[in-house]
Design a protein with these regions (language model features):
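Transmembrane alpha-helices and adjacent helix-loop boundaries
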Residues: 1-235
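C-terminal boundary and immediately downstream tail of ABC-type ATPase nucleotide-binding domains
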Residues: 224-226, 230-248, 472-475, 479, ...
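H-loop/switch region of ABC-family ATPase nucleotide-binding domains
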Residues: 457-458
Length: 507
């Protein structure tokens, strides 16, 4: 027995098969697209801390991943027998098949999205919070673009799976490829030739549309991009076009309130107390370095200042006005207004990897509409990049920069919102020794310009040289709060000063 090749090749000229191909592509693409969106909402609900959201989402995923698609198809198609009013649309094989594919694929895609969302570093969300972005803004501009890039290979694979699963819709008489083939070989009994042609059509669809999706994946692959350093001529041109930022200057008027005042700040994680009644005043234009052994509460302290950590009790006053109290008493409107006056630079940089250096700096001002003019925003971003010595790298992505360069971009991003106060969380601890100097130079320049800064650091020489005061924390309390000159005065034999000098290694 041999195959009827003439019949086999004739199947590629049949209009019925090409119409069936259109049906397969249409139902698969719609199911993939709708399932993609619905699956994201299910994944978000499943990850929610609210039980009224995560429990129904978990049940939905569990149920539709457990029930075979064929069972769902037959059930949905026959649902009008229970609810006659649904017959107008569920009685149509295409719609019944689409609904069945969507609810089933939404359950699978929810897990794909969940893995993508979990892969986005926590620091990315914290950076968005520090830039005073809302939850939806962080999701839209930071989390979702990164999660989609991470999940794209698996999502492409799921599209291929849907194309193949669409063959099951033949069970409810949808004239897709398999149904068309079955009708043919039922008449001529050329089963192998017909199914071989059906397989070829499926391979063609998967190859064409899989290639399109893989092209999109390559376009979204940030690490594969390698923009070059701008030429010296281009840098001079951009420098001439740049617009200076409207920097705020410190007010030293008599009777002016402190820039920041912490009153009886307390913070615990379960039974472990991290901050035990911290009190601190910082004048406008003052630079305060916070030092201390690991676990002393330094980082936790500055993270409470911009609500990255909540307070158990106590309050924070910003320029004489209420800012943060414990969870029950903080005013959301006051918090949002105050957050715009505080910037933060993180130990691990937390630049947005899917954006260029220029886009990293432009994003927050554009989000807040400060300025509204996109061209002004871009020119101010060029000014900030020139200020930190990175104008030539404007079009590069964070992965192309050294650690020191990334931290300088992070500082420029913080300055883009013209904050009154900047918090630095160990800005040099993640850097190689030779890169530390370039970051410290930028911070020193800010100090000379009168920027109010709180710097958590292990760079003792730097703390003594740039700070107006050095605060030492230990066991969740401030052990010493003194000017560098007092610390270096070896005639002062008080126990606290001796301990501080020993810790700083200046004896």
């Amino acid at each position: 027995m041999s195959l009827d090749w003439e019949y086999f090749f004739s199947l590629f000229t049949m209009i019925a098969f090409w119409k069936a191909c259109v049906t397969v592509v249409l139902i698969s693409t719609l199911a993939w697209g709708i399932g993609l969106v619905l699956g994201f909402f299910v994944a978000s609900a499943k990850m929610s801390s609210h039980r009224w959201l995560n429990i129904p989402a978990k049940v939905f995923v569990w149920f539709f991943r457990s029930v075979p698609l064929l069972v769902v198809l037959v059930f949905v198609y026959n649902l009008p027998q229970l609810f006659p009013s649904t017959g107008a649309f569920l009685g149509v094989p295409f719609i019944a098949g689409l609904v069945s594919l969507v609810v089933t694929e939404a359950a699978y895609m929810a897990e794909i999205h969940r893995s993508g969302l979990l892969s986005v570093a926590k620091g990315q969300k914290e950076a968005g919070h520090a830039l005073n972005m809302s939850y939806l803004g962080i999701q839209r501009l930071i989390v979702i673009p990164q999660a989609i890039r991470i999940s794209m290979p698996t999502l492409i694979n799921e599209y291929v799976t849907i194309i193949k699963l669409s063959s099951l819709v033949s069970a409810i008489s949808l004239p897709e490829l398999l149904q068309t083939g079955q009708r043919l070989y039922a008449q001529n009994f050329l089963v192998l030739e017909t199914l071989l042609a059906v397989a070829a059509y499926y391979v063609l669809i998967v190859t064409v549309f899989g290639s399109v999706l893989q092209w999109i994946e390559r376009r979204m692959d940030v690490p594969s991009r390698s923009p070059q350093t701008l030429s010296e001529t281009a840098c001079h041109r951009l420098c001439d076009e740049s617009l200076p930022m409207p920097m705020r200057t410190a007010s030293h008027a008599a009777g002016a309130p402190p820039a920041l005042q912490l009153r009886d700040i307390r913070k615990s994680y379960g039974e472990h107390t991290v901050l035990q009644g911290v009190n601190l005043k910082i004048k406008e234009g003052e630079v305060v370095s916070v030092i201390g052994p690991s676990g002393s509460g330094k980082t936790t302290l500055i993270r409470t200042i911009n609500k990255l950590e909540t307070l158990n009790s106590g309050e924070i006053i910003l320029f004489g006005e209420d800012f943060i109290k414990d969870n029950e008493n903080t005013n959301p409107a006051v918090l949002r207004k105050g957050m715009l006056r505080i910037g933060m630079v993180f130990q691990s940089f937390n630049l947005f990897p899917h954006m260029t250096v220029l886009q990293n700096i432009m994003m927050a001002p554009r989000y807040h509409g400060k300025p509204n003019d996109l061209d002004v925003n871009r020119k101010q971003a060029y000014f900030l990049l020139d200020r930190v010595g990175l104008l030539a790298h404007a079009d590069k992505y964070p992965h192309q920069l050294s650690g020191g360069q990334q931290q300088r971009v992070a500082i420029a991003r913080t300055l883009a919102l013209s904050p009154d106060i900047i918090l630095f969380d160990e800005p040099t601890s993640a850097l190689d020794p030779e890169m530390v100097g370039e970051v410290l130079k930028v911070i020193q320049d800010l100090a000379k310009e009168g920027m109010t800064m709180i710097i958590v650091t292990h760079e003792m020489d730097f703390a003594l040289s740039v700070s107006d005061r050095v605060v030492m924390m230990e066991h969740g309390v401030i052990q010493m709060n003194a000017a560098p000159s007092d610390i270096l005065d070896e005639t002062n034999k008080q126990t606290a000063f001796v301990r501080m000098r020993e810790f700083m290694g200046v004896n």
